[in-house]
Amino acid sequence: MQIYLVGGAVRDTLLGLPVTERDYVVVGSEAQTLLDLGYQPVGRDFPVFLHPQTKEEYALARIERKQGKGYTGFACYAAPDVTLEQDLLRRDLTINAIAQDQDGQLYDPYGGISDLNNRVLRHISPAFSEDPLRVLRVARFAARFHHLGFYIAPETLALMRKLSRSGELNHLTPERIWKEIEKVLSGRNPQIFFEILHDCEALNVLLPEVDALFGIPARPDWHPEVDTGIHVMMALREASQRSEQLAVRFATLCHDLGKAQTPAHILPSHHGHGERGTPLIRELCKRLKVPNDCRDLAILVSELHSLVHTALQLRPATMLKLFDRLDVWRKPERLSQLLLCCQADFYGRQGFAEREYPEPEYVQQAYDAAVAVAVKPIVEAGYTGEAIRLQLSRRRIFAIRDVHCRWNDK
């Protein structure tokens, strides 16, 4: 029995990155041997075991053959006669097919070290196109390692495009798609993931609402980049630099979905796009089973981001309605989330990096003034029932008006 460290742990060590988990492949053994040694079986579809002490994963070397649709349509053969090279051959990319034995010796039958040094994401064999999930995985690796200069080999991108056109992506479950999106939105440079999916024609299958934004024109004075899809990618990059919150990044991705449905006769203006985006967000989130907090913030940002951009022109009563719609009195974190998305939207435009954007500061000050209005004096003044709410709203409007006047006097 021979044991090798494989996959991400070897790759990340060679890249000088921290290793968070270790996976091993076991060659020349069988399931009963591992069971006798106290390993715990955890793989339902594949022979995977947990080490009795470290709880790290150990998998028997195996061969996979395509026999059905989707990423689960594989027959697995695991036996003592499966070699290390055969096991590594089934993996997606050369950089993930490097093994290391217990003495530290590296095994690299498919040129992974060379591709690591040259910053190339390259598939190992034509069998790459048998697994539709690999389209998402490669795009995610491209995003994850973008800061290191990695790019996808042209022949691999061509296979990804072929796979996207084959219909295989339709067999991915909503849960699996969201899991990949969640991973990429939680990491570095998430915009790269969506740009690559657009380039390889997978985005129109997986997230047609986002893909539809590419090619939609916007006013060049407000969006010098013109293309709405490009703007959303720029905004997502900004959001990822300003916040690690999944909900903020997802809401930024979805904030302009309504622009794809702007009537042609009013283009390149997009009046009402926030409201048009709401049903699209609901449908997307229902289809992919997106968590409720991500869905709810995305809807609010779609509806309200244009109001924040014009906050200094809003009447105090309208500003209070914005706060009420956010339910900031019970969920104050929503305001900071909305403002982060609006900042990403504003600065996610060509040539806007040095522009002033005072509106978020004004909105925050207006909220601080409104939330400071106390209920106790209203009750002590003799108001009851609905009259308390009306008087509270009235006093909050006055507080917002004071802030508005101070800003106008600047």
Swiss-Prot record:
Classification via Gene3D superfamilies: Beta Polymerase, domain 2, cca-adding enzyme, domain 2
Free-text comment on the cofactor: Magnesium is required for nucleotidyltransferase activity.
Binding-site residues, ATP: G8, R11, R91, R137, R140
Catalytic activity: a tRNA precursor + 2 CTP + ATP = a tRNA with a 3' CCA end + 3 diphosphate; a tRNA with a 3' CCA end + 2 CTP + ATP = a tRNA with a 3' CCACCA end + 3 diphosphate
EC number: 2.7.7.72, 3.1.3.-, 3.1.4.-
Family matches, as SUPFAM superfamilies: Nucleotidyltransferase, Poly A polymerase C-terminal region-like
Chain sites annotated for binding CTP: G8, R11, R91, R137, R140
Chain sites annotated for binding Mg(2+): E21, D23
Cofactor(s) demanded: Mg(2+); Ni(2+)
Domain called HD: residue spans: 228-329
Keywords linked to the UniProt accession: ATP-binding, Hydrolase, Magnesium, Metal-binding, Multifunctional enzyme, Nickel, Nucleotide-binding, Nucleotidyltransferase, RNA repair, RNA-binding, Transferase, tRNA processing
Summary of subunit composition and partner proteins: Monomer. Can also form homodimers and oligomers.
Function, in words: Catalyzes the addition and repair of the essential 3'-terminal CCA sequence in tRNAs without using a nucleic acid template. Adds these three nucleotides in the order of C, C, and A to the tRNA nucleotide-73, using CTP and ATP as substrates and producing inorganic pyrophosphate. tRNA 3'-terminal CCA addition is required both for tRNA processing and repair. Also involved in tRNA surveillance by mediating tandem CCA addition to generate a CCACCA at the 3' terminus of unstable tRNAs. While stable tRNAs receive only 3'-terminal CCA, unstable tRNAs are marked with CCACCA and rapidly degraded.
Note: A single active site specifically recognizes both ATP and CTP and is responsible for their addition.
NCBIfam families associated with the record: PRK10885.1
Name recorded for this polypeptide: Multifunctional CCA protein
Originating species: Tolumonas auensis (strain DSM 9187 / NBRC 110442 / TA 4)
